[in-house]
Amino acid sequence: IAREHGLEVDEASFKSSMEEHRLASGAGKAMGSLGGEGVDIYRGLLAELEANGSLPNTGVAYDPYSRRQVDGVLLGLIANGKPVTQANLGDNVEVIIPDSCFYIESGGQVSDHGVISAQNEEWEIQIQDVRKPAAGMIVHIGTVTFGAPQVGDKAVATVDAQRRQDIMRNH
């Protein structure tokens, strides 16, 4: 467009000035966390789970419409941004299971709440949020309310059906 109007642009100086401005303005840090900062952790864990056969190459199965409960295995736990093999009472964790019946926030409808618990009832995690931090990866975010869940434990994921119904009715 500049050439069409007989103007010249010093692109090198422009790029240099833009970089100086970007750094002086905090390089976008004033906005805080924009999401996606920890995506490599999720991608790495997903690749590992696909490679060892725990997940298909399509990742975590997602069907929040036909079921409100699924059985599975605790494939992964993330605490403080790092994969762990076990969590303890009071820990805030992200839980990975092979199949999710929890609705992920979309189109103005909030994520489901519910419980992921051991099939043998030795532990329980109250789920307060569900996210998809990378393609194929779904994490259930919650707090261990009793016991000590471990990767490899058999688990049951149960959506709070009353809460979902109330949200759907008002959405």
Regions found by a protein language model. Give the residues of each.
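A glycine- and charged-residue-rich anion-binding loop/surface
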Residues: I1-H171
